[in-house]
Structures are given as C-alpha cells and as structure tokens.
Amino acid sequence: MTLVIAGERSGAGKTTVTIALLAYLIRRGLNVQSFKVGPDYIDPMFHAFVTGRPCRNLDPVLTSESYVKKCFSRHIQDVDCALVEGVMGLFDGVSQKKEEGRRKKEEGRGNKEEEQNYSISFASTAHVAYLLNLPVLFVIDCSRLSGSVAAIAHGFRSFNPNLNFAGLVLNRVASDRHLELLTDALKPLNLPILGVLRRDEAVTIPDRHLGLILWLRSPTVFVLLTQILISRVWC
C-alpha cells in the first residue's frame, strides 16, 4: 500500500492521520517507510518515533524531480507499505508548472476534454503525488463544517483531475449527528470516507508559528500515541 496524506490547508490534521496510520500498520506487523514532502524536519521526527526508521524527505526544490523519484523508489524496496505526508494544502507550492497531459492521453485513450493540460504548483503535495503516481488520501478539518464539506471535497478533487483521490478522512468530528450531516452531504460525490477522527484535545499535536512543537518537548505526543495504539483515533 502506498498513499499520499494531503489536506486542504496546514493544520487540517495530516500529521495526526499519518501517525495514526503508521502506528496501525506497525501494530499489524508490517514494515512501513514514511516520507515527508518538503524540507521539514519536525514531522519526520514523529514518523521515526513511531516506525523506528528514518523518514525520508521528498523535496524537488532542494533536490530535483529525478532525485525525488529515485529516493522514493530506493526506500520502498524492502517495505510492505509507504506513506507520504504532504505539506500545507494539497496544491500549495512554489510556482506553477504545466503538466504534459492526462494519463489517459499518455496511454493513448481518452477524448479531447480528457487530454487537456492542468497547471500544478511545483513542490506541492499534488506535484509529488503526480510525480510518483500515488493515490491521495485527503484530510478535511470538519470542526466548523457540515454541508460545506462537500464543496471542499468536490473542489479539490475536480481542480486537477490528473490526481487519483483514494478517499477522505474527516477530522475533528464532534458527534454522531455531526458525522451524519457530513456523510449525507458527501454521498453525491461517491468519494469513499476511509476514516473519521473524533474531536479530542488529547490527540491534538500542539503547534507554534514555525510548525509543530518538537515531540521531545511535548508530553502531549505520548498521549496521542497511546490513544492511537488502543485504537481510539482510527475508526
């Protein structure tokens, strides 16, 4: 299994979901390699704490597109699963670049509408997902949403049809009634809801203006990991 964990913005819950999935897979006895889009070093510390192996950064700005491909290919050779945590919002990068066209065009199939080009931000999570041909697990912070969740999901999925959306994770869901409103709104999109994280301050990683608090300085992370390991986070 290989997945990119993306979100609609910073703070949506990408790291929490990534840690939850890593812990779940490790608990099942699988060998898992984690990756992080960009040069960030704090999130990889969380990953390594859970997996027991170094997280690898995928940064086409400081390296190159070819290096990103090579790095990913090299470090998934001896593992069962690979998870790539994205950066910021799905389409947030440093500049715009033009894709060569839909994969359907590359495969010699599809109509003209399907063969059009789409812009993508260089070094964004979307760029790396497209570069590595990986499906996207999309995390949405639902703490202040109900029906509007469908507009967000539809907008991100349709913005660049080249990306393969595997499904959604609904984060910070307040109650069963809240979940019902969200799922009812999302039904017409036929996007699988693959995970739900309930609102719980005990499983929130504190952050600061420069990113997440270092795990060595944050006892909250130990509460988070404990909750994950007893399956309170992932459902």
List each model region and its residues.
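ATP-dependent carboxylate-amine ligase catalytic core
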Residues: 2-97, 114-131, 140-163, 176-180
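Short, basic, low-complexity termini and linkers enriched in Ser/Thr/Gly/Pro
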Residues: 96-119, 231-234
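Short hydrophobic alpha-helical runs that function as membrane-insertion/retention elements
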Residues: 136-139, 194-196
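Conserved beta-strand segments of the P-loop GTPase G domain that flank and frequently precede/overlap
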Residues: 138-141, 169-171
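Internal gly/pro-rich beta-alpha loop/helix module
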Residues: 146-235
